[in-house]
Amino acid sequence: MAQGTIRFWAAAKAAAGVAEEPYEAETLAAALEAVRTRHPGDLVRVLQRSSFLIDGDPVGTRGHETVRLAEGGTVEVLPPFAGG
């Protein structure tokens, strides 16, 4: 099982109450399920609207269960940003 870091930005950071936390998961889907378990409530809603970067690469429309996580990797949680 891969271990790495999940970073929360903007509304995701506010909802999680932390800027980052470790993950231990093989896929993005498994990592996000663990996050939902640790942070029920507002963060669950924020995750539904968020986009994700894996080691700097956008996940886009790929199924989260198909996105493999690397040892020492980073998942960035990017909620929609307001403004312009």
Indicate where each model-derived feature is located.
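Ubiquitin-like/PB1-type beta-grasp interaction modules and other compact soluble beta-rich domains
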Residues: 1-83
